UniProtKB/Swiss-Prot annotation:
Gene: Cxcr3
Family the UniProt entry places it in: Belongs to the G-protein coupled receptor 1 family.
PTM summary: Sulfation on Tyr-27 and Tyr-29 is essential for CXCL10 binding.
GO biological process: angiogenesis; calcium-mediated signaling; cell chemotaxis; cell surface receptor signaling pathway; G protein-coupled receptor signaling pathway; immune response; inflammatory response; negative regulation of execution phase of apoptosis
GO cellular component, one term: cell surface
Subunit organization: Homomer. Forms heteromers with ACKR4. Interacts with PF4/CXCL4.
Pfam families, per the entry: 7tm_1
Molecular function per GO: C-C chemokine binding; C-C chemokine receptor activity; C-X-C chemokine binding; C-X-C chemokine receptor activity; chemokine binding; signaling receptor activity
Protein name stated in the entry: C-X-C chemokine receptor type 3
């Protein structure tokens, strides 16, 4: 059961000074949310035992589902690479980002189950890789939303002229921003031995103010801004589709709603918990042992919900799409024929037939 502590058990001045001078916060983007740092002397048995049981199982499951699902999306997209639209290219990058993110989960599973055994170098790389692809997923979804907004609402294709150059530049900017946001991981993450827990963990080594600043950056740049872009774009798209004619509008409306709802449902709970933690960091909410234990467990559960978005992406952007199943089946059939008869040349077709793009939908994925 949760640790029941009186609300009067608020940090005194000596506890706060100890926290600011000795804080070594863990990697705080969800994969290891228990405070393994030299935090105020609160018992952490419940949250640590919960993480050791819950996180390894969850991360292993998400690793398998995310790898298989996004691998299937990437395979189908690459099979149509000569006819990819701008949104298709963003979706391919999104699948790659999700794959790279889930590839770090086994490392964090080991860290949660026992301790970090991979050294400081891999700690920095794994932490930065996770952070880069966390931001990349949100930014690419925003790019897809904006591309659909221009195409459907304004009937404008900004990537029609020199499409490969413009799409490539957009992707370079997105990945560049993600690397920039991950610089603190390269600098401050390290494998540190926690004497209180007698274990080594991949964690940040900087004052509490730096930990709070990173959480605010994640909340604003990695969640609120992309969500606002998606909500604005898809609200206008829905307005246009509601006055359009034909049965296709209902299918497009369903997918549009699912896009925004899935992102919000998966990530909103986690960021609300992070907001509570930020408010405790800055003193707006009193930090006590009971509340801290509840927040630690809540971060573990809600971060798992957020990572589920990597597994949902193939379902939302592929399996719900109009032509993905058909293209996946054709790809499997071609692979089967290749094994039996040797390599065969794919029949030529027009861009409209082979591309994942249509006039009112972004791609065969159905966006």
């Amino acid at each position: 059961m949760y640790l029941e502590v009186s609300e009067r058990q608020v940090l005194d001045a000596s506890d706060i000074a100890f926290l600011l001078e000795n804080s070594t916060s863990p990697y705080d983007y969800g994969e290891n949310e228990s405070d393994f740092s030299d935090s105020p002397p609160c018992p952490q048995d419940f949250s640590l035992n919960f993480d050791r049981t819950f996180l390894p199982v969850l991360y292993s499951l998400l690793f398998l589902l995310g790898l298989l699902g996004n691998g299937a999306v990437a395979a189908v997209l690459l099979s149509q690479r000569t006819a990819l639209s701008s949104t298709d290219t963003f979706l391919l990058h999104l699948a790659v980002a999700d794959v790279l993110l889930v590839l770090t989960l086994p490392l964090w599973a080991v860290d949660a189950a026992a301790q970090w055994v991979f050294g400081s170098g891999l700690c920095k790389v794994a932490g930065a890789l996770f952070n880069i692809n966390f931001y990349a997923g949100a930014f690419l979804l925003a790019c897809i939303s904006f591309d659909r907004y221009l195409s459907i609402v304004h009937a404008t294709q900004i990537y029609r002229r020199d499409p490969w150059v413009r799409v490539a530049l957009t992707c370079i900017v997105v990945w560049g921003l993600c690397v920039l946001f991950a610089l603190p991981d390269f600098i401050f993450l390290s494998a540190s031995h926690d004497q209180r827990l007698n274990a080594t963990h991949c964690q940040y080594n900087f004052p509490q103010v730096g930990r709070t600043a990173l959480r605010v950056l994640q909340l604003v740049a990695g969640f609120l801004m992309p969500l606002l872009v998606m909500a604005y774009c898809y609200a206008h798209i829905l307005a246009v589709l509601l006055v359009s004619r034909g049965q296709r509008r209902f299918r497009a409306m369903r997918l549009v709603v699912v896009v925004v709802v899935a992102f919000a449902v998966c990530w909103t709970p986690y960021h609300l918990v992070v907001l509570v933690d930020i408010l405790m960091d800055v003193g707006v909410l009193a930090r006590n042992c009971g509340r801290e234990s509840h927040v630690d467990v809540a971060k573990s559960v809600t971060s798992g919900m957020g990572y589920m978005h990597c597994c949902l992406n193939p379902l939302l952007y592929a399996f719900v799409g109009v032509k993905f199943k058909e293209q996946m089946w054709m790809l499997l059939m071609r692979l089967g024929r290749s094994d039996q008869r040797g390599p065969q040349r794919q029949p030529s077709s027009s861009r409209r037939e082979s591309s994942w793009s249509e006039t009112t939908e972004a791609s065969y994925l159905g966006l």
